[in-house]
Amino acid sequence: MSETPPYDAIESEDDIEDIMRVGGGTVVLDFWSETCGPCMAMAADFEHVAAQFDRGEVRFCKVNTETHGNLAAPFNVRSIPTLLFIHDGKILDAVVGKMSAKTLGEKAEWLVSKSQRKPGLLGRLFG
């Protein structure tokens, strides 16, 4: 029996819509392929970092562009690996290229900190 990976495989437009909807949470989205050397070199680091976070805190997801390349088009992904850092349906940052586990962990921490910010006065009044 294999262990469940600490990330979700995104395989449909419905999955993407779930991530991108307002209230969709905090997400690290990795566009990758098995034929991409840097993607495969980063795979273990991605899994390791994903395992360090609670899914309620930040959700790690992967889109295999070989089998689901159509899901990359709306994000204008032209190179892989591409990682998107998303909160509440908004892309806050994008990184193209291999990331170390340390850098990925730091980016995920940054994303979590953005999601935990309390709204300012205007946000409380009009949000």
Could you describe each region identified by the protein language model?
Residues 58-60:
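Hydrophobic/aromatic anchor residues within beta-strands of the central parallel beta-sheet
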Residues 36-39, 83:
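The canonical Cys-X-X-Cys-His
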Residues 38-54:
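Typically the conserved alpha-helix immediately C-terminal to a functionally engaged Cys/Sec
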Residues 1-27, 106-127:
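N-terminal leader/targeting and pre-domain segments
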